[in-house]
């Protein structure tokens, strides 16, 4: 089915956001793991996989609309050097992605492409949950202090 060129452009922009998120969250996960912060590793790894699933959904929709998924224009990863910087980097990426999603949703609605709109609404719900989690973690860091927060992220290793 031939799709609207502008909706395909929106979907490709969102795909690009997801591709950056996959890599950024995966690297952050492995950095957390290396530091022994297994709870943060597990959460970041899970988020990376979720972003991969979102990317897959965008690719399928773009192909259905007879567009070409753009996997080449990768944005810049913003890799933090400490826990708080990493979470802030992830939050900035999620907030930018949510803004792009809202723009895409509004455009899809205006051209009556309800399937693309519903896809983006579904993904926006996931992104908002991640934003809420990141904001909560940053609030905990501010209230508890980074040392207490970091200590709470350590799980006993199973031998």
Swiss-Prot record:
It catalyses: 4 Fe(2+) + O2 + 4 H(+) = 4 Fe(3+) + 2 H2O; Fe(2+)(in) = Fe(2+)(out). Its cofactor is heme b. GO terms for cellular component: cytosol. The keyword Cell membrane does not apply. Binds 1 heme b (iron(II)-protoporphyrin IX) group per dimer. Pfam families: Ferritin. Its EC number is 1.16.3.1. It is an enzyme of class 1 (oxidoreductase). Fe cation 2 binds at residues 51, 94, 127, 130. Fe cation 1 binds at residues 18, 51, 54, 127. Heme b binds at residue 52. GO terms for biological process: intracellular iron ion homeostasis; iron ion transport. CDD domains: Bacterioferritin. The keyword Iron applies. Signal peptide: none annotated. Keywords: Heme, Iron, Iron storage, Metal-binding, Oxidoreductase. InterPro entries: Bacterioferritin (IPR002024), Ferritin-like (IPR012347), Ferritin-like_diiron (IPR009040), Ferritin-like_SF (IPR009078), Ferritin_DPS_dom (IPR008331). GO terms for molecular function: ferric iron binding; ferroxidase activity; heme binding. Residues 1-145 form the Ferritin-like diiron domain. Belongs to the bacterioferritin family. Iron-storage protein, whose ferroxidase center binds Fe(2+), oxidizes it using dioxygen to Fe(3+), and participates in the subsequent Fe(3+) oxide mineral core formation within the central cavity of the BFR protein shell. Homooligomer of 24 subunits, arranged as 12 dimers, that are packed together to form an approximately spherical molecule with a central cavity, in which large amounts of iron can be deposited. PANTHER family: BACTERIOFERRITIN. This is Bacterioferritin. It comes from Serratia marcescens. The gene is bfr.
């Amino acid at each position: 089915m031939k799709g609207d060129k502008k909706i395909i452009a929106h979907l490709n922009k969102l795909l690009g956001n997801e591709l950056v998120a996959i890599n950024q969250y995966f690297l952050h996960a492995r950095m957390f793991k290396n530091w022994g912060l297994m709870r943060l590793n597990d959460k970041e790894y899970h988020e990376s996989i979720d972003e991969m699933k979102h990317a897959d959904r965008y690719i399928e929709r773009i192909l259905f609309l007879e567009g070409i998924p753009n996997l080449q224009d990768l944005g810049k990863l913003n890799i933090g050097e400490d826990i708080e910087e990493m979470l802030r980097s992830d939050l900035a990426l999620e907030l930018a992605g949510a803004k792009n999603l809202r723009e895409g949703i509004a455009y899809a609605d205006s051209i009556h492409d309800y399937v693309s709109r519903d896809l983006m609404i579904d993904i926006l719900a996931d992104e908002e949950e991640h934003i809420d989690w990141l904001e909560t973690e940053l609030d905990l860091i501010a209230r508890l202090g980074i040392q207490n927060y970091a200590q709470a992220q350590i799980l006993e290793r199973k031998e």
